[in-house]
Amino acid sequence: MVNNCVDENLKKRIRTCLSNLPITINTSYGDPFQPDQWENTLNKIKYLKEQNYQGEVEVSTKWILSNEQIDELYHANPNLWIMCGITGLNEGKGVTLEDRFDNYLRLCKRFKRTVLNTRPLIPNKNDSMDILTPIIEVAAKGNKLLKHGGYLDPSNSKNKKTKYDELRKEIHSLCVKLGVDDGPRCSCIVTDVTGKINSTYEDSEPKNLDVLKALGFDFEIENGFVKLIGFRNSGIITKGDVSFARLIIESSHIFDNWTDSHQYMQMKGPENQTLVCTSSWFHWAREVPCQVGCWYCHVKPGTAIYFVAGDSGCSPIDLYSMLFES
């Protein structure tokens, strides 16, 4: 539905906001670089480039890429963020830890925004420095960027990620010694590298409130914080709505008052597809059966966290076109 009640100056600002959202590609169910997903992932990256998309673009993967694929990917977008998964949990038949180390280092040679992603850390599985030290040492040989995080039980959508405060200190201590940046979130690492605002931690007055309203979000301001009260008079707030609004206002000054814990948004895409937003990324994904086979996966069909089958998301610029262009 086209919104004709927005003036041209505001439209320009809305387009700028949407075209600067951080976006993750094909990180739903199915690895973005597995054979039956490779072309789709590559096409999405190229499409964003053709649109002159200004936001950070990311893929999370545990797939082993050939040098030819790395070259093709580099030509599509040399500034791509690649979260390269190495957990020590032996995912994928016939893939050794050394194979994963080699894959990571080859990616680092071409992509300066390759991050070694050792997530999840699962209690009594890979949550020890005996397992993590060799992984961190390899991160130090690459781009010196490390992401780690807790385990989310796929059988319970209301569970939070496991905490590992003491281990976190040990990881950080070794990272400091080796010169590795182990930002607590993807968004922290992105900010460290690019200098862009990290909405999760930005302690400042909310911006773009007129943009948020024009996009259909109902909200109040309470003690300087945005308090969502619904979307287009729905009276419902999802976790995805809050995450998306936080990215728009470029501030942490928003209440986590969601009434639905799923990451999907109430806004729909140009083809009425589900839209998904997490704390760090807006999602654009095609769902395919995953060929990596992570036994701990929390987004595969049948888990409590899984919400809806099929494709989700779109280019945010296409979202703008749907809402504000005839």
PLM regions with names:
Residues 15, 41-49, 70-74, 101-108, ...:
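Short amphipathic alpha-helical segments and helix-helix/interface helices
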Residues 99-156, 170, 174-187:
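Conserved C-terminal portion of the radical SAM core fold
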Residues 3-5, 29-37, 89-105, 122-133, ...:
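Conserved non-cysteine loop/helix-boundary elements of the Radical SAM core domain that shape
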Residues 23-34, 63-67, 80-95, 118-125, ...:
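Conserved radical SAM core fold
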Residues 44, 79-83, 126-146, 193-212:
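Short, electropositive alpha-helical surface patch
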Residues 20-27, 55-59, 79-83, 112-116, ...:
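Hydrophobic beta-strand segments of well-ordered beta-sheets in folded domains
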Residues 1-81, 279-287, 294, 298-326:
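Conserved Radical SAM active-site core
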Residues 155-326:
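C-terminal accessory extensions appended to soluble enzyme cores
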